[in-house]
Amino acid sequence: MHLLRILPAALAFALAAPFSSLTAAAPTTLDLSHQLDEERAERLEKLIERFNSRQKDYEVKLVRRVQGDPPKDLNLVTREEQARFVAAKANFKPLHQVMKEANMPFEAGKLAPELRVGLGDAKGELFALPIGLSTPVLFINKAAFSKAGLDPEKPPKTWAEMLKAADKLFDAGSTCPYTTSWPSWVHIDNLSSWNGVEVSDAKGRLNFNGLVQVKHTAMLTTWAKARFFIYFGRRDEADNRFAAGECGMLTSSSSLYGPLHESRKVEVGVSSLPYHDDVPGAPQQTMAGGYSLWVGAGQKPAEYKGVAQFVSFLMEPDLQVEFSAVAGFLPMTPAARAAAGSK
């Protein structure tokens, strides 16, 4: 009787064992916290799906960040949030340490210098990855340029050329020859950097009242009175106006290129931010803003290994080129930038 009770159990175990051994282990889940708008989240989701399909050990999931929640495995942080994240170092694990412990190659020195600002220590080691940074550029409405007798393949390079273009657009009937999004970022921070003007003194005190800044602000005031420059708000309100075909020229984030290109409502031309050709040494370089990727502290070793693999995936030049093309973000390495420039 005792034997009869044991045999069915043994048989069941024997039958189940081969099938259980065939069952693949579930992938380790890596949460990526973000506060992106729906459109940008969809773009990032496509990139994540590609990583997930290339290997079976890890599954990255995009989750919306809730205020007060502890950091996730991966955290997409804006420039505005960055100071708070740097201050709360105990909540995050330095990226260079994650890569070293996972024995994954990672050379921070290969990343463009302007992208590493504020994300590393004195030794050049990175705390986070500058994955989603953008810079201000000039967008033009090619149809509006053609209507005004302007060459749509030759966007203005200087503010003097911008004035001539705005004048012709206005004469051609445009009610919005030129507009801008993010005015303080474009017309203070980047105007100063692009034209080689300091925005703070040796003690770190802000100084926006230099000759170039005052002259530029006065110029925009004159343009506004002449209806050459139309102001829609201090954030990205002007983006929608340009996307709807209302404006001939727009200065805004390079990350707008993807949505504009995909909407196909406006045939768009893109050029560098205009500079003042009467300022010695101009142009120099614009400033990068946008998103960086931070790693949460207190995660499991297997999760950190997956994070390192995901970061290596993001560093691939071909992927950077593609992401730059669809999202307008800056390629992180000179090699990727060279590849992007050849396409």
Spell out what each predicted region is.
Residues 325-343:
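Long, aromatic- and glycine/proline-rich binding clefts that accommodate carbohydrate-like moieties
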Residues 53-54, 148, 223, 229, ...:
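Extracytoplasmic/periplasmic substrate-recognition and gating elements
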